Amino acid sequence: MSCSLARLCLLTLLSPPLSSAASISPAEPISQAYSLALYMQKNTSALLRTYLQYQGSPLSDPGFSAPELQLSSLPPATAFFKTWHALDDGEWLSLAQRAFLALTQHLQLVEDDQSDLNPGSPILLAQLGAARLRAQGLLGNMAAITTALGLPIPPEEDTLGLAAFGASAFERKCRGYVVTREYGHWTDRAVRDLALLKAKYSA
């Protein structure tokens, strides 16, 4: 074997393999995620409205709103403009993936709660199940975007822990209100941020 050929073989062996993510354009998964988020956005108000309708007073009272109610296990979608504007793509994707992972788990919990509290409400249960599946789908799209950009995917975690159990009927109703409300808020935020990503990485 000649010296030059031996050198070429050695360089080939030492060269790191090309990342599969490097050959994937982020434009396609971003477009898919954006389309799904837009579709989800069309249904979030109906989900919240249907949910409140089945909970009884005061939640079902006209004009009910309780923005002060929050869940420590579910990150709020609101953020100061300066903080949001300073996020890079990786930071936003990480926050969004953690939020929609938490939402899928919380929506399953709310679905279980409503099966117990309102077993005769197939429309509500169907809407909750559909919202959970769409949140899972958007989470998968965001993972594909993250991979295409060569960024690490946040690890899955149990966001509910022990806090999900032992709540009263009214506490479970309020918890479901917060979850369905924040599902809408996070979907609105996803639409806005994915639109920016779509413009940035358009083919």
From Swiss-Prot:
GO biological process: cell surface receptor signaling pathway via JAK-STAT; nervous system development
Signal peptide start-end: 1-21
Glycosylated residues, chain numbering: 43
Places the protein is found: Secreted
Pfam families reported in the protein's UniProt record: PRF (PF06875)
InterPro entries the UniProt entry points to: 4_helix_cytokine-like_core, PRF/CT
GO cellular component: extracellular region; extracellular space
Keywords recorded for this protein, A-Z: Cytokine, Developmental protein, Glycoprotein, Secreted, Signal
A GO molecular-function descriptor: cytokine activity
PANTHER family tied to this protein: CARDIOTROPHIN-2, PTHR21353
Family: Belongs to the IL-6 superfamily.
Free-text function comment from the UniProt entry: May have an important role in neuronal precursor development and maturation.
Name the UniProt record assigns to this protein: Cardiotrophin-2
